[in-house]
């Protein structure tokens, strides 16, 4: 596993096994942040709720369903691009690559890149970052399919303490 340093931040580490661990803010920090942000945004003249609060487990599942609709083309376009790059990309990579993904979700597109990385190197390190607990499920699924994969995930927003 990588030397991900646990700075003096308010994260709890969960070690699932030698190939999977993830970090997540302590529950009290999440609850306090939610209460503060909702209170602040609903006390403004123009009331709103930050969309990040839509991405709980159910919200993430709903978004994954939306991405497979015929009307939602970005995911299909991205997959098409990645498939076209599948044969050319390895010539630009060396044998010591890590993969960091912001907004990993169910890691559907990630698999296309992992297919390349795992053929190039004996061990692949993957760092998914997602606001939702879906990260844990998708990481466990990836480990079933990629023996040489090691995952260190972060369940948080991009502006979380771990990214400062």
PLM segments and residue spans:
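Conserved SAM-binding loop
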Residues: 138-142
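Glycine-rich helix-loop-beta junction characteristic of Rossmann-like nucleotide cofactor-binding loops
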Residues: 87-95, 117-120
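N-terminal auxiliary segments of SAM/dcSAM-dependent transferases
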Residues: 2-52, 60
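S-adenosyl-L-methionine
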Residues: 143-164
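Conserved SAM/SAH-binding beta-strand->alpha-helix loop
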Residues: 132
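Conserved class I S-adenosyl-L-methionine
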Residues: 96-105
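Class I SAM-dependent methyltransferase Rossmann-like catalytic core
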Residues: 46-90
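Conserved SAM-binding loop of SAM-dependent methyltransferases across substrates and taxa
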Residues: 106-121
